[in-house]
Amino acid sequence: MKRSALILSFLPLVFGCDNPKSPGHSCASVYSVSSAAASSFCATFTASTVTATTGVPEALLSNCDYKTKHLSSACSCLGTAAVPTVATPSSVSSVYITSATATPTSFTFKTSTAHIVKVAKAATSSTAVVTTPVSVPTASSSFTGNGGTTCTVTEYAAISSAVASCSNILLSDIYAPPSSTIDLQGLQTGAAVIFAGKTTFGDTADSDFDPIVVSGTSVTITGVEGHVIDGNGAAYWDGQGSNGGSDKPDHFFVVKDMYNSRIENLYIQNWPVHCFEIESTEHLTVSGLTLNNSAGDAANSKSDGDPAAHNSDGFDIKESSYFTLENTWVHNQDDCVAVTSGTDIVVDGMYCYGGHGLSIGSIGGKSDNTVNGVTFSNSQVISSQNGCRIKTNSGETGEVYNIRYENITLSDISDYGIDVQQDYLNGGPTGEPTNGVTIANVTFVDVTGTMSDGKDYYILCGDDSCSNFVFDGVSITGGSGDNCNYPSTGCP
């Protein structure tokens, strides 16, 4: 019974069933997010014989307008397809193999990040689900698996067996115990991993611990509609991030040695410190993600009045080439994107809220200190400290060249609209630039917007270490005290 209920709970996702009333209505969302409760309820609910709403789970009832016809419509979606035959291999606990054919048969998972689904406890202690539209680039698409063996994993202990033996892996409502990494480093070439339900983690007070690690070739990592990956950040947040305080996982989702692959349509919330570390990848595309660390904006008992989350970078990118990050929404408390090394990198269609903007750096003092060919384009930076920033570490060496910011809209920026600093230290800038890191061929095109405070432009270069900066269609207003020691003509 448990097995068939689990398979049934994914039918509206696999077959793309939409709410008959209106797409995006909270009734559809609650059936996706509360899939177990919905499946159990729908198994006995019949609109023709049940017209009262007594006994209906409050989470389903309140989000379906207290109307049995809406409940019935959503239940009909759950039952529109036949449940496939499921074989449970005795050698792999909690892994359900749903196909194992000699000729691979493709399958489709409908995915979307058009809405953020907030789950909160109502006064009655039932789960209330509210779908809140946000200014996030819509990334709704269909993912087609590669056929072969498809496995559904419901227990952490079964992940390693599935990684070794399955072409397509559906991770359903996984709880990773303390000190237990979701290790996806041994994936088969061409494998697909699909997150479903809510993925959660036990407490692990260790800065060297990585909750999720993935690598592979021609791999796809994605999520079905309504899934949530929750990093348990509130257990660690103390206002200090990686700068001090208690030990906490430094990078939540580590992507390394990944080639010709895609990561798409994931919803991640409440990561402890940095979210993604992208390292040593080639021809990797990351698309349509929602990173929501908004809960970390509030102070807690450990943060001394400051936001509880700190150093919560969305994406840290290093030693990677031909990397694309696109159509992604980030609400955090540090760099939205930070490129510290790599070549041929495109960051396009970003919505960055609450953090430190679109950054190159900091550069210097690392194993690789070269950034060549990075384009940030068609993006918004909102209610953040900085808009477009290049930062190099004081007293270190390296090189930054061929950087382009194009069609970037800024709003409510508090510190710097455009910021190039060669005096950077994590504890604070020195005010004295050094010239060990060269910065050349930097272009700002159609970078526009407004400041709430701070400086529209701040450029502090070392002696002869900056060259060939171009400003075209740049207009940032609302700040004061602009200061640019390069170019010789002054600030834009």
From Swiss-Prot:
It catalyses: (1,4-alpha-D-galacturonosyl)n+m + H2O = (1,4-alpha-D-galacturonosyl)n + (1,4-alpha-D-galacturonosyl)m. Its main location: secreted. It is found in: Secreted. This is Probable endopolygalacturonase D. It comes from the Eukaryota. The active site is at 334 (proton donor), 356. Its EC number is 3.2.1.15. PbH1 repeats lie at residues 216-238, 258-280, 281-319, 320-341, 371-392, 400-422, 434-478. Belongs to the glycosyl hydrolase 28 family. GO terms for cellular component: extracellular region. Disulfide bonds join 151-166, 336-352, 461-466, 484-491. InterPro entries: Glyco_hydro_28, Glycosyl_hydrlase_28, PbH1, Pectin_lyas_fold, Pectin_lyase_fold/virulence. PROSITE patterns: POLYGALACTURONASE (PS00502). Pfam families: Glyco_hydro_28 (PF00295). Residues 1-16 form the signal peptide. The keyword DNA-binding does not apply. Involved in maceration and soft-rotting of plant tissue. Hydrolyzes the 1,4-alpha glycosidic bonds of de-esterified pectate in the smooth region of the plant cell wall. Keywords: Cell wall biogenesis/degradation, Disulfide bond, Glycoprotein, Glycosidase, Hydrolase, Repeat, Secreted, Signal. One of its GO terms (molecular function) is polygalacturonase activity.
